[in-house]
Amino acid sequence: MSCIQIISSSQTSIAGHRKLCNKLFTLRTQEGFETDILRALNIILTVKKGNSNADRVLRFLVTFVNYLQQKDPEIDIVQPILKHILRGLDAKDKTVRYRCCQIIARVVNCVKEIDDDLYNTLKEKLLSRVLDRESIVRLEAVVALSRLQEDTGDEENDVRNILLFLLQNDPSSEVRRSVLLNIEVSNSTLPFILERARDVDAANRKCVYARVLPKIGDFRYLSIKKRVRILKWGLNDRDESVEKAAADMLAYQWIENADNNLLELLERLDVSNNSDVAVLAIKKFFDVRVDSLSQLEFPEQFWLELTAESSLLARTFNEICIEKNYTDLLDKMPEVVQLTYYIERQYVSLRDKSSYDESCFIIEQLLYIGLSQDMVDEIGRRKLLKSLTNSLSTMALPDSLISLHIELLRKLCSSENDFCSLLVEIITEVFEQGHSQNQTEEQGNSNAPELNKNDYEGEEITVSQKSPSPSLPPNELNEPEPDDMDGYKEAFNELRCLSYVQCLFENITSSLNENLYMVDMLKTLIIPAVRSHDLPIREKGLECLSLVCLLNADLAFENVPLYLHCYEKGSVVLKCTAIRTLTDMLIQHGKAKFTEYEDAISSILFEALGEFENAELQTLGAEAIAKLLVILHYRDELFLKPLIIQYFEPNTVDNHALRQVLGYFFPVYAFGAHENQWRIATIFCDALLSLLEIYRDLDEDDVQLSIGHIAQQMLDWTDNEKLYERKTQTGDDYIALNHNVHLHLANMIFESLPNASEGKERKFMISLLGKLKIPTDLPSSDYQRTKRKLETYESHGFTMDSTSLSILAKFERMLLQNEEARSKFEETEEERLMENAEENEHAGAEAISGEIIPDTVEANMEDEEEVYVKQEEDL
């Protein structure tokens, strides 16, 4: 067999490639051997992607090159092949460029050494091909170029830099995946690789967890921040395959790196600062390794030597057992009496400043366990209640523990009234501890009030007007004056009491008028705090007042001016509190209650939405408006256009929170109700013209999103086929909702065209007509109305280019065809109805003329006549 015949035989099957390699190897010394190899490659170059025969031939040739290098290294066939194929990298035919890159990628992989000149030529050519306009060419060029990577820390590494650029910016997900799999992992490339865990393509995200991260080896090479971020992204991914890949990586590879010790793995995640991710990681771990759950044991010594990691593991184990209904495994959890003892042990540990944070974290996990207990043990319930009450009264706990203590306290109390009574006693005791008797006498009023439900006439509480000074280094601290210390203690005590009050109102639902304790709290603590000159106290007081306002509509109405004033004159924190409170009050009590303040509330929401210098406040304003529109339809016509503009506004491109809020809001709003979709269509043109004006003044480098993409997104919101309820029933028929929304949109476009600037903007608005979905079964009057608007626009005599004229002519023909078809249908339908009416009328007349009186009716008439005659005779 000749060389060409052997190569031709390789296209039938891969199974015989080894034998064919041996046969071809015997011909290596023949004259023209190299030429035959190149001829075979030339044939492959013109074969399009997907041809299995060409792929098998190429695979055979690569196998032979590798085989030849092993058997006879003196024969160099690689250099001639590469030099020959390099000539085709600049070909006009995309198939040739694709095959050339593919051959280079396969052949270079077989080479251990390469000539410097050839290396530089290859690199130069491939650097241009990775930017090819065809994605299939870029894909193979990336594979080929990755073989030329140099393991250097030089920032001027051209190959690495271009691969990183493609990894971040290439529009093709397959090209990005190719870079991801082929780029070398190093300190300089690792951040870009991990970034692909947030890729828009699910296959790429899965690739990070299933193929790239295992190549790194021990996860401890990653920083704690990177470990937590990787787990958070993967385990929360919306795609099930990505989530499973991340869970498998955790449950098999990472646990193996931690010597199959779950506690050691948790130690590497810094659970004290990343408890949410750690809890999720444990749950996913046991989802994959279900058998390991029953193997966990919690002996007495475990509870006596709790750490942050072990306490979190116990809490998560308890939650899993409850969620999965593993009642037999729940027996491993301690009883309420034992749990109380373990909590009290950690209270003692709080005295040690070195372990304070860890002890707080452990107490938090034990309280979570307590929240899930059934509390049927009355002795245990009382002990735990006493322990929590004592800790709240005597210890300065962080806010996170205060909220959990009070939440558990609410569960332990039999009724809401008992809960309020108990917590009022605790607050009274805490308040008295922070105010000395001497201070009370000097002030001459009841500064430490007895919070009694029979006493509402107490004076306002006053606190020091001195704000705590900024912290200083230890060597610069001076001994504070006694008066200053008293002021600090009072302010701190006030904040502590207000934290208790805030948690109290967060855990009750009864009306303000039904609970006298709440009225007491309002008068003696909250109102004085709102009037305080200490900013932290005033902020906390306003938060507490907002919770009270949610329980009483009249109180909410009375305090609207206060929160409006807070927004106008207050700090950023107060502005955020004001927006949240006003929004919650509108949602809770209804917009009808606050009609008087509609303009004022709308004004501050507008102002917040335009706060470009404060991203948090701007996001909060957008979120508040979005809630009001979805839930209450609060002044849709006023807020909808500004929201759309802010969503696409170039200045908000870095405000990711705002984009996320609005990105969720618009589909929910548009597809949730057909009325909302109609509103979007109504303001479509006004919003788009405003955006055109904004984008007109931008430089090309500042444009993040083209106006065409913006219009396409807005058109998608007006697609009636995506409505949650697409049809409504009227009688026995179903009518499609918003069936004519795009015809309505066409009317709005014609009305807005005179307002658009001549040239590109007007041409762009006209081009939208070709993207509308106009149904053919609307009433003919609808088409006539749109046609009249088109004729009105044409009568203005605006100058238009040929493309715009063509679009308008095509749209007009479509309207005429639909109108004529529907007119004929309506005439036919009208004639049919008239015929049916005439037939029914004729049938009714025949029935009346041929009607016969029944015998029973005649008999009744005769009886009535006889009775009448008899009555006359009697008279």
Curated annotation (Swiss-Prot):
Its main location: nucleus. Belongs to the CND3 (condensin subunit 3) family. The gene is cnd3. The keyword Protein biosynthesis does not apply. PANTHER family: CONDENSIN COMPLEX SUBUNIT 3, CONDENSIN COMPLEX SUBUNIT 3-RELATED. It holds the Pfam family Cnd3. Component of the condensin complex, which contains the cut14/smc2 and cut3/smc2 heterodimer, and three non SMC subunits that probably regulate the complex: cnd1, cnd2 and cnd3. It is found in: Nucleus; Cytoplasm; Chromosome. HEAT repeats lie at residues 55-76, 77-113, 117-154, 157-192, 222-259, 379-418, 516-554, 556-591, 740-778. Residues 831-844 have a biased composition (Basic and acidic residues). This is Condensin complex subunit 3. GO terms for cellular component: condensed chromosome; condensin complex; cytoplasm; cytosol; nucleus.
